[in-house]
Design a protein with these regions (language model features):
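Exposed acidic/Ser/Thr-rich ligand/metal-binding surfaces
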Residues: 2-190
Length: 190
C-alpha cells in the first residue's frame, strides 16, 4: 500500500542524470590578446579549445547551447539535444573577435533559456578574461542561486580578472578554472 508519494525502488546504478550546459563565450576585442606566448594562441583561441573539450564530455542524453558576447550577446547555438557533435564544434569554432565587453546580459540570457530545459542538471560555463564592465554581479549571482542553476568560470589569459571570476563561480556553486596556455587547458568535465 502506498503511503508516501515516493518511489522506494532503487534506480539503476547505470543511470546517468541528463545535463543541460550553456557555454557563454567572450569574443570581445580583449580576447584577441595573446593568451599562450608559446603557441601564439589568442585568449579567444583558448576559450574555443576549452569549449570544444567540454563538448567531448557530453552524451546524447545531454543538451548544449552557446552564447557569445562582446558589447551585445548572440545565441551562436540555441540549446539543443547533443546529437551531432561536429555541428556543435562548427558553431563554437565559428566565433570571431568582436567589440566591447558586456557580460551580464549574456549570463541572463543563458539562465533564462536553460531553466526551460528538461534536464536533471543545469550548468552554465563562462569563458572570458573578465575585462570590461563593472564588478557588481550580486543580482546575477542571486538569480542563479534562486534558479538552482550552477555557473562555472574559466579565466582565460594572464590578464584575466581572476578575482572576479572566482567570486562569480563561488557565488553560483560552480567551479573556477584558469587557463593561459593550450597545454594546461582545463578539462571542465572529467
Amino acid at each position: 500500500e502506498t503511503i508516501l508519494p515516493v518511489d522506494m525502488m532503487p534506480r539503476s546504478t547505470n543511470e546517468v542524470p541528463s545535463l543541460a550546459m550553456v557555454m557563454v563565450i567572450d569574443h570581445s576585442g580583449s580576447m584577441s590578446s595573446a593568451g599562450d606566448p608559446v603557441s601564439g594562441a589568442t585568449n579567444l583561441d583558448l576559450a574555443i579549445t576549452a569549449a570544444d573539450r567540454a563538448v567531448e564530455e557530453l552524451t546524447e542524453n545531454d543538451y548544449v547551447g552557446v552564447v557569445t558576447f562582446d558589447d551585445r550577446y548572440d545565441w551562436q547555438l540555441p540549446i539543443t539535444k547533443v546529437e551531432d557533435k561536429d555541428e556543435i564544434h562548427k558553431a563554437i569554432e565559428s566565433v570571431a573577435e568582436g567589440g566591447g565587453t558586456t557580460i551580464k546580459p549574456a549570463l541572463s540570457a543563458a539562465l533564462n533559456e536553460i531553466v526551460k530545459c528538461d534536464a536533471d542538471i543545469k550548468h552554465v560555463i563562462l569563458l572570458t578574461d573578465g575585462q570590461g564592465e563593472d564588478r557588481n554581479y550580486g543580482s546575477i549571482i542571486q538569480s542563479y542561486v534562486d534558479s538552482g542553476v550552477t555557473l562555472s568560470t574559466v579565466a582565460v589569459g594572464a590578464d584575466s580578472d581572476q578575482s572576479l571570476l572566482q567570486t562569480i563561480a563561488r557565488g553560483c556553486s560552480g567551479r573556477y578554472y584558469y587557463c593561459d596556455n593550450g597545454t594546461d587547458m582545463p578539462k571542465i568535465f572529467a
